[in-house]
Amino acid sequence: MDSSEQLRAEDNQSVVSRMQKNYWRTKQVFIKATGKKEDEHVVASDAELDAKLEVFHSIQETCNELVKIVEKYQLRLNVISEEENELGLFLKFQAERDSTQAGEMMDAAGKALCSSAKQRLALCTPLSRLKQEVATFSQRAISDTLVTINRMERARTEYRGALLWMKDASQELDPDTFKQMEKFRKVQNQVRNSKDSFDKLKKDVCQKVDLLGASRCNMLSHSLTTYQRTLLGFWEKTAQMMTQIQEACAGFHPYDFLALKRLQDTPGNLTADCTEGQTEGSCLTTDLNKVALSEEEEEERFEREPAVARALPRDSLEGDDFEKEFSFLNSLLSPTSSSASEFTQECQPACGSPCTGLTSQEPSVGPGSLTSSSQFLPSQLFDLGLHADGAFNTPNNGNQDMSAWFNLFADLGPLSNPDAIGHSDDELLNA
């Protein structure tokens, strides 16, 4: 009866111990998940382990990235080899139609490009092997190390949880009265066991990470050596072929190509042209403004002139030009001219009166008579010109002989009768 009760008490204590252990472990997980600050001495004791874990994560990430890069590299090699082969075939096809030296050059270059494309595809073999080895390394070595790391993390969580449990039990411990001494010994024993398990796994993790890094270096050095050897052979063969083509085409006649790079002027030239156009436009605008101002001044001056002067054309009002144009009339209209006396002698027997009657009407000619008379005579226009000339400070001779002026109009109109100028129809009949 006593033995059964003792076993039952031990079972109850073991259940309580497991519950307490799970409680403190869960508390440690919560502290780690929330990022709360832990004991600095405990964290410092795991500094070497944390460094190894960083190396492991770096190896894991770089291996995954290397697999992706090798896949993309293979795709790019296939594409560039295909394009290079197409270019070589095109050059060979065009060389068959061209019998000149250019055709020979295209044929040689096309063969070299096709050969280079085939040799470039040889790089895919070491790359495929590298990809396979890296994938195997990730699936086996890294996965095995990751399993060990996960076990170590669980052991570390239990160990740190046991430390929290022991810290809590030490606060209730009273060595003098032996209170809670048994409980503290149990917790201390639990901490010791969890520490042993954690230290063992910690050592395994550090060794596996070191071995993982070394094995990766050996794998890459072996695989990349094969790739490097293949790549160097490819470039040596390609360079040799291109050198032979260059030597074979050394004596060919070179071709000079001129390419039109730009179809329009540079922005600087366009700016200069626009500036010149604006300058010319401004000069033209200035000239037009000057002409407009001069015209306005002419109109204002013309409005200030007398009415008789405005009745004449503007060109006739200029003194120098008027005298030059009608200088021959001065000799004809002078009182000493012989033509005036001859006209007077002829006119006296015919008209019965001196010809001075014709000239006596001269002062009455003006703008008013021009507007009121029903018959406009050229002599009146001439008299008007004489009056206008007098308005510009020219002497007015009242007894000028008009015969020369009549003869002038007779020459202009041969069919008209010069004797009828200045006489009415009755006077002509009486004559």
Swiss-Prot record:
Positions of region (Disordered): 295-316, 351-372
Gene transcribed to yield this protein: Ica1l
Q: Which organism is it from?
A: Mus musculus
Q: What InterPro entries does the record tag this protein with?
A: AH/BAR_dom_sf (IPR027267), AH_dom (IPR010504), Islet_autoAg_Ica1/Ica1-like (IPR024114), Islet_autoAg_Ica1_C (IPR006723)
Could you tell me where the Polar residues compositional bias lies? 356-372
The record's annotation in SMART domains points to: Arfaptin, ICA69
Q: Which residues belong to any copy of the AH domain?
A: 44-247
Q: Where is the composition biased (Basic and acidic residues)?
A: 301-316
Any GO CC annotation of this UniProt entry:
acrosomal vesicle
What Pfam families does its record include? Arfaptin, ICA69
Q: Name one GO molecular function term.
A: protein domain specific binding
Q: Which GO terms describe its biological process?
A: spermatid development
Q: Which SUPFAM superfamilies match?
A: BAR/IMD domain-like
Q: Please report the name of this protein according to its UniProt entry.
A: Islet cell autoantigen 1-like protein
